[in-house]
Amino acid sequence: MSDIDQLNASLLAEIAAANDEAALEAVRVSALGKKGSVSELLKTLGAMTPEERQTRGAAINVLKNAVTEALAARKATLRQEAINARLKAETVDVSLPVRSSPAERGRIHPISQIVDEITAIFADMGFSIAEGPDIETDYYNFTALNFPEGHPAREMHDTFFFHPDENGERKVLRTHTSPVQVRTMETQKPPIRIIIPGKTYRQDSDATHSPMFHQVEGLVIDKKANVANIRWVLEEFCKTFFEVDSVTMRFRPSFFPFTEPSFEVDIQCDRSGPIVKFGEGTDWMEILGCGMVHPNVLRYGGLDPDEYQGFAWGMGLDRIAMLKYGMPDLRDFFNADVRWMTHYGFRPLDMPTLFGGLSA
């Protein structure tokens, strides 16, 4: 056995015997360091004849490569063994109670809670969730929703526009979640029953408005959808959401470009106290907008309005959260105030269900 073969066997044995990364690093330095055994052999290449370099030089390079590969493989093995040992030692007892210190107790944001509540309600009615991009094209945000040229919503004072792209097109931060209606109609055959929760953006900011706010809307498309269906769906939703036995609602004629006929919906309530009470009283409060999907919107979605019809509704999540839980200022939703979250937030394990209670 040549000296190179002996050195190779010795180094590979030392590498295999290394029990941790520190020991392995010591072997690497002794072999490949500036004065390592393999490095010293490489220094002799310059003094060799061409014939020796072809044979002995090649053998030295093979040795170097073998040692390098063995070091890398052993290092990977040691790291995996360390991870396995750590995982074995670190156990989590899932039966332990949640930490009770107020400083350590997390809270679910009211908006997340409201989304979960609404999802639970409409899932029980057979609806699914649909989503879409926050950055929209003019086509999906306006044109496909029957907004005419020159509509105020297309102006800079109301909508956040991006700079024009290379084609001159200006994208927008969506002003409503309605573009998802058209996107869904393009990709899904009727019957369609969806709700669309998400962020929306408009240039408005005060105690009840924010430049970024949350909406949810619903869409039903089939061959027999009608206004009576809208009323039933919304009444069932409001009863369940506000956790009352009955609600009285009134539908006022209104105008939205994407529905015809269009309605604004008021719910009867009692506003005499600091908290609005639903299901009682003689006051009225506007809560959402709705209507039958405009035939032009159906056409943009690739559906024949002579065969299909539908209804849609939309409401502000932030606003109904304020109404239900008595929050006075919308801006507090986004201030990241731990005290506010401690007061208005929800415990993580209290998931809203129709059987256990939405806001338990």
From Swiss-Prot:
NCBIfam families in alphabetical order: pheS
Annotated HAMAP family: Phe_tRNA_synth_alpha1
Gene3D superfamilies tied to this protein: Bira Bifunctional Protein, Domain 2
UniProt xrefs under InterPro entries: aa-tRNA-synth_II, aa-tRNA-synth_II/BPL/LPL, Phe-tRNA-synth_IIc_asu, Phe-tRNA_ligase_II_N, Phe_tRNA_ligase_alpha1_bac, Phenylalanyl-tRNA_Synthase, tRNA-bd_arm
Subunit annotation: Tetramer of two alpha and two beta subunits.
Any one Gene Ontology molecular-function term assigned to this protein's record: tRNA binding
One Gene Ontology biological process: phenylalanyl-tRNA aminoacylation
Cofactor: Mg(2+)
Keyword annotations from UniProtKB, A to Z: Aminoacyl-tRNA synthetase, ATP-binding, Cytoplasm, Ligase, Magnesium, Metal-binding, Nucleotide-binding, Protein biosynthesis
Catalytic activity, reaction form: tRNA(Phe) + L-phenylalanine + ATP = L-phenylalanyl-tRNA(Phe) + AMP + diphosphate + H(+)
Subcellular locations according to the entry: Cytoplasm
One Gene Ontology term, aspect cellular component: cytoplasm
Protein name in UniProt: Phenylalanine--tRNA ligase alpha subunit
Note describing how the cofactor binds: Binds 2 magnesium ions per tetramer.
Domain of life per record: Bacteria
Record keyword rRNA-binding present: no
Family according to the record: Belongs to the class-II aminoacyl-tRNA synthetase family. Phe-tRNA synthetase alpha subunit type 1 subfamily.
Cleaved signal peptide residues: none
